[in-house]
Amino acid sequence: MAVGVFDSGLGGLTVLDAVQRRLPEVPFVYFGDNAHAPYGVRDADDIFHLTCAATERLWAEGCDLVILACNTASAAALKRMQETWIPKDKRVLGVFVPLIEALTERQWGDNSPPREVAVKHVALFATPATVASRAFQRELAFRAIGVDVEAQPCGGVVDAIEQGDEILAEALVRSHVEALKRRMPHPQAAILGCTHYPLMEPIFQEALGPEVSVYSQANLVAESLADYLARKPEFAGAGTESKFLTTGEPRSVSNKATQFLRRRITFEAA
């Protein structure tokens, strides 16, 4: 019973780390489309086709359930995939859902009308493609009313993290937070809408201030996955071994991933 985890690069490893800790008995197959990263600057059609290709590769590894551990793919491709492409015996889940569940304090299956929630002012930090898709605002509007969302496209942050340039990544995060606070001086909550950003969570929190609740995805996604598999065990696929696949150069990606997670990760060519 293997579960697939997909990202355009290394950010999804933050999600993989959390789901492995939460579900140590489940094998996971991670697919990084490093040859085409970052997705955050690509158009929606391009993201759709790349995400479908990666998902098919994970199905071939015996993963009937695939997690898009990439907000750009979840925002720009998932709805179209679910409506036009995914067969009935497979499931593809995005990473927005657990965030919105946490923010609105309601379960995904709860289809009651949108209602007032405690949080009124939300800052969203994400890639330019995720911000342009407005997927977060759309999903939030189905569940909550009266929430003001101010979105900040965080150009350059993913590239800096993938290159291992922490000083540049930190400087960019601080400048993006400053830019957002000029438009929304007092957010109550901040959504880190990219799976790379948990690595920068302390910097976001420091720049935003202690009064802002920062929602980061990895642990929320892990809890959601555990709940999903408990309810739908038939989607734990036939695969039996954990592995790491990449469209990039395996040695280079392995070295970056090892730096990224601070434990040895060995990728093989997809």
Curated annotation (Swiss-Prot):
Family membership noted in the UniProt record: Belongs to the aspartate/glutamate racemases family.
Binding site for substrate: D7, S8, Y39, G40, N71, T72, T195, H196
Protein name from the UniProt record: Glutamate racemase
Family annotation (Gene3D superfamilies): 3.40.50.1860
Highest classification ranks of the organism: Bacteria, Pseudomonadati, Pseudomonadota, Alphaproteobacteria, Rhodobacterales
GO biological process: cell wall organization; peptidoglycan biosynthetic process; regulation of cell shape
Enzyme Commission number, as recorded: 5.1.1.3
UniProt xrefs under InterPro entries: Asp/Glu/hydantoin_racemase, Asp/Glu_race, Asp/Glu_racemase_AS_1, Glu_race
Enzyme class: isomerase
Any one GO molecular-function label of the UniProt entry: glutamate racemase activity
Pfam family, one: Asp_Glu_race
Active site: residue positions: C70 (proton donor/acceptor), C194 (proton donor/acceptor)
